[in-house]
């Protein structure tokens, strides 16, 4: 008897609560008050009206989605049995730097050649692709909201000039 099965699972993940962080204007004001770092008046105005500055949480966080698809067929006779199944998994995390994909194929064949001899074949194949930019949430939460994202001349992602030794988290995102 032939049996066919299919299964689909979809999942969604989201951060429950974002951190209450300083915006670019508040951060620039704090740098000026506590470290004596001064910004030009037009720059401060741009931070204040929101036309300049980086909201790292809005930039780096997304809704994570998981999609898992399974399909299989099995059957046979009393002496010959088979099972063939396939699985595709696609996951994007809550951070834009992380993604995981996997495809699997499985084949099982059992053939009873005699009462005392059965030939079994089992084949498993899998292909996996993962991207983890090495960025945890604290990396981008500590990045300055007042920095320029890229060097305008080279196009290279800038490092935070004030308080992080880690690379620019946006540069590690999944393309």
Question: Can you describe what each PLM-predicted range is?
Answer:
Residues 58-60:
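C-terminal beta-signal and adjacent terminal beta-strands/loops
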